[in-house]
Curated annotation (Swiss-Prot):
Biological-process GO terms, alphabetical: autoinducer AI-2 transmembrane transport; quorum sensing
Transmembrane intervals: 14-34, 39-59, 70-90, 93-113, 115-135, 157-177, 213-233, 252-272, 284-304
One Pfam family matching this protein: BPD_transp_2
Highest rank taxon of the organism: Bacteria
Role of this protein: Part of the ABC transporter complex LsrABCD involved in autoinducer 2 (AI-2) import. Probably responsible for the translocation of the substrate across the membrane.
Topological region Periplasmic: 1-13, 60-69, 114, 178-212, 273-283
Assigned protein family: Belongs to the binding-protein-dependent transport system permease family. AraH/RbsC subfamily.
Subcellular location: Cell inner membrane
Induction field: In the absence of AI-2, repressed by LsrR. Induced by AI-2, via release of the LsrR repressor. In the absence of glucose, induced by cAMP-CRP by direct binding to the upstream region of the lsr promoter.
Protein name: Autoinducer 2 import system permease protein LsrC
UniProt keywords, alphabetically: Cell inner membrane, Cell membrane, Membrane, Transmembrane, Transmembrane helix, Transport
């Protein structure tokens, strides 16, 4: 049973999402509707994109805590370009390139300069946030064109154009990681760095690619954020990095690298977002969201740690079972007495 749970974390995450959707339905039948699903998905798109990028980094046994700042910085660039008169396609391409460049810089610090990922990205977290505030002067960016907001308007089956793009990206990345040698290189790099090098995997390049794509996903999340609310506050992206990491852990992405699936991270992001809608239904103040999400994450981490320890004990027991000789059987004393009498 323990091995099944460990090997099928996506199934357990899916069950948690389904239960969190069904149980509130007993309190309000209107909650069980397609409209609720589309609403939750629309709210979850930013976190899903960030979780997809964080998955690539975590698979290589690294972590990036600067994605919130990258999201904010890229959203600010998008707003500035649009207000300066540039077209939406040009502004979006420039925004994605900035995110790619920011992620590439993180990757260079980690892979080439050998700076621990948590230290490097803590530094760039402040750097990118500072650039964002320098560009805006601490002010909000408003007056964005209506065509930007159309990106998040319902297009087909209640899902926006960006929503469908997110679905396509999830499917493509799931296929890439599961079915291609390039995708498996991320797992190999995080599972055994030296072993991956001996197999010919360019581990430094893989880690740089992981950070670069993570930055690109953060930039896309910034575009989604701006299109959904129509303006850009000076604190855009604050705290999103922790939610992205939490979504990955909830979905079964190992902090030790080398295991997990993109679908699990998406389900984790959906679960964290769905908590908001349940709190609204239960009329619980919104500031409870972080507390409940943190409590759930802590419970998952404790459970994951205990599960890993139990599996390791079981594997050791199976490994050394053939070396353990059974204790010698003790013959009954009565049989010995009968032989002496004979």
């Amino acid at each position: 049973m323990l091995k099944f749970i460990q090997n099928n974390r996506e199934i357990t995450a899916l069950l948690a999402v389904v239960l969190l959707f069904v149980l509130p339905g007993f309190l309000d039948r209107q909650y069980l509707s397609v409209q609720t699903l589309t609403m939750v998905y629309s709210s979850a798109q930013i976190l899903i994109l960030l979780a997809m990028g964080a998955t690539l980094v975590m698979l290589t046994r690294n972590i990036d805590v600067s994605v919130g700042s990258i999201t904010g910085m890229c959203a600010v660039l998008l707003g500035m370009l649009l207000n300066a008169g540039y077209s939406l396609p040009v502004a979006c391409v420039a925004t994605l390139l900035l995110g790619l460049l920011a992620g590439f810089f993180n990757g260079v610090l980690v892979a080439w300069l050998k700076i621990p990922a948590i230290v490097a990205t803590l530094g760039t977290l402040g750097l990118y946030r500072g650039i964002m505030l320098l560009w805006t002067g601490g002010k909000w960016i408003e007056g964005l064109p209506a065509e930007l907001k159309q990106l998040s308007a319902p297009l087909l089956l209640g899902v926006s154009a960006i929503g469908w793009l997110t679905i396509i990206l999830v499917a493509f990345m799931a296929w890439l990681l599961a079915k291609t040698a390039f995708g498996r290189s991320f797992y190999a790099t995080g599972d055994n760095l030296q072993g991956a090098r001996q197999l010919g995997v360019r581990t430094e390049a893989i880690r740089i690619v992981a950070f670069s794509l993570n930055g690109c996903m953060a930039a896309l999340a910034g575009i989604v954020f701006a299109s959904q609310i129509g303006f850009i506050p000076n604190q855009t992206g604050t705290g999103l990095e922790m939610k992205a990491i939490a979504a990955c852990v909830l979905g079964g992405i190992s902090l030790l690298g080398g295991s997990g699936a993109i679908i699990g991270a998406v389900l984790g992001a959906w679960f964290l977002t769905q908590i908001d809608s349940v709190l609204v239904l239960l009329r619980i103040p919104a500031w409870w969201n972080d507390f409940i999400a943190g409590l759930v994450l802590l419970a998952v981490l404790v459970f994951d740690g205990r599960l890993r320890c139990a599996l390791e004990r079981n594997l050791r027991r199976q490994k050394y079972a053939r070396f353990m000789t059974p204790p010698p059987s003790v013959k009954p004393a009565s049989s010995g007495k009968k032989r002496e009498a004979a």
